[in-house]
Amino acid sequence: MAEFVGVALLVIFGAGAACQVILSTNPGVSPSERGSFLSINFGWAIGIATGAWVSTGMSEGHINPAITIGMATYRGFPWREVPGYIFGQVLGGFVGAALVYANYFHAIDIFEGGHRTQATASLFATFALPYMTQASCFFSEFLATAVLFIVFLALNDKHNGALTNGLLPFALFILFIGLGASLGMQTGYAVNPARDFGPRLFLAMAGYGKAVFNYRRQYWIWAPIIAPILGAQAGGLLYDTFIYNGDDSPIKWR
């Protein structure tokens, strides 16, 4: 339940900020534009911080399947709990998107003229810029998630100045501002399969149809799902190989 609420908050703040910024560019929605790409970065950063604050006391505070799988691989998180965590995370993404969509339903209708297209689907799920190749999309998500997991491991490393639960959300806030400002433009920096798949599933049911899944040869599975999972695995390998001094790592040869 904590992972569900954490991801729901993440999407409410992140997708909500995206809706306000993009939809307000239409004069029929708002008399003036309300924000910029930085506003969207802040929305996702506030979402990850509040999601972590709410969930850390009751769960591990992963609110990201890539983090959950990474922690199971490198820090002994029980594999038997992974499916339940991921289910809660994806459901949280679905519900968070549904709530934001309900809040901005009329604005979306005005912006789209009654139709449902990628222009507003991208407010909830990630879609790469047209010039990006398949390999470039994969690498962008892989790199961003590797960085995310390296920092996440460091923040929880007792041998490397681990933060208390109270400070962890603030550190994640700074991290997400940085990820958005440096690696967010080209693919929308999903770095979290639940934050993309949950809202994408909702979009398919809310009138956007199968186009959200058919986009760029099933982009939805290999860029915002597979790439983050593998990116977290690579980040964990690098951290445990070169930095980690604990005895609970599967990398024993150091």
Swiss-Prot record:
Record organism: Laccaria bicolor
Induction / repression: Expression does not significantly increase during development of the basidiocarp.
Chain location of the short sequence motif NPA 1 per the record: 64-66
Keyword check for Repeat: yes
Protein name (record): Aquaporin-5
Domain remark in the UniProt entry: Aquaporins contain two tandem repeats each containing three membrane-spanning domains and a pore-forming loop with the signature motif Asn-Pro-Ala (NPA).
InterPro entries xrefs: Aquaporin-like (IPR023271), MIP (IPR000425), MIP/Aquaporin (IPR050363), MIP_CS (IPR022357)
Motif (NPA 2): 192-194
Catalytic activity: H2O(in) = H2O(out)
Organism ancestry: Eukaryota, Fungi, Dikarya, Basidiomycota, Agaricomycotina
Role noted for this protein: Water channel required to facilitate the transport of water across membranes. Does not mediate the transport carbon dioxide across the membrane.
Topology of the protein relative to the lipid bilayer: Multi-pass membrane protein
